[in-house]
Amino acid sequence: MGKILFFGLLLICIFLGFFFYKQKENNVIYNKIVEKFDDNVFVDETYTYLFKDSNLKELVFIKSQLIIPELKHKKMIKATGYRADAYKALSTVYRFDFKVHDNKILGFKSVIFEGFEDAKVSKHENNLPSEKWQQLKDFNIGDPNINEKFFHLEFPFVVKNTLCVTISKGFFKKIKKLKRLKIMLISNEDREYKIDIENFLPKYNL
């Protein structure tokens, strides 16, 4: 009985390891998770860049794919309407998560990608599903004042703030061509957080 349990657990570990693995290269930690439900597949890939000497601790790039065979049919690709349009807009989502540690809850009123200062930015809430996602131009930074009532508070512990920036496929293709990622975040207190790193995105098949 003990041997059966041991080999059962071993098989489970191998199975999980097949769908979930980590790879660290040049300060970038790579994760991939594949989940299947019915005939549908969800693939989540994350690329985490770690910072050492700053309140800005992590830059995380996330590519999420939802594969629904029924909606990938040629007829559906040419179809129009809310369901078809929503799937086309959301089947692949690109996102940057910026993780900033402080003793306060922060809001971020501006995100600037150097070289694309004229990019079209939206500030609607990151709720899905939403018709607004079908109208995403360059990138969305969410509502900067969603936690405004807490901005004045200071805490005796570290607050881990996360700014989620969803980018369009077209804008992703543009920043993928850059040699370096130069990004500036501006908080509700006008504090600037600057990023200047080698662009790791072209190294991966995205």
Curated annotation (Swiss-Prot):
NCBIfam families registered for this protein in UniProt: VirAssocBptA
UniProt record similarity statement: Belongs to the BptA family.
InterPro entries: BptA (IPR031471)
Effect of L206F: In strain: 297
Phylogenetic lineage: Bacteria, Pseudomonadati, Spirochaetota, Spirochaetia, Spirochaetales
Keyword match Transport: no
Subcellular location: Cell outer membrane
Domain of life per record: Bacteria
Protein name per the record: Protein BptA
Organism: Borreliella burgdorferi (strain ATCC 35210 / DSM 4680 / CIP 102532 / B31) (Borrelia burgdorferi)
Protein task: Virulence-associated protein essential for survival of the bacterium within the tick host and therefore within the natural life cycle of the Lyme disease spirochete.
Cleavable signal peptide: 1-19
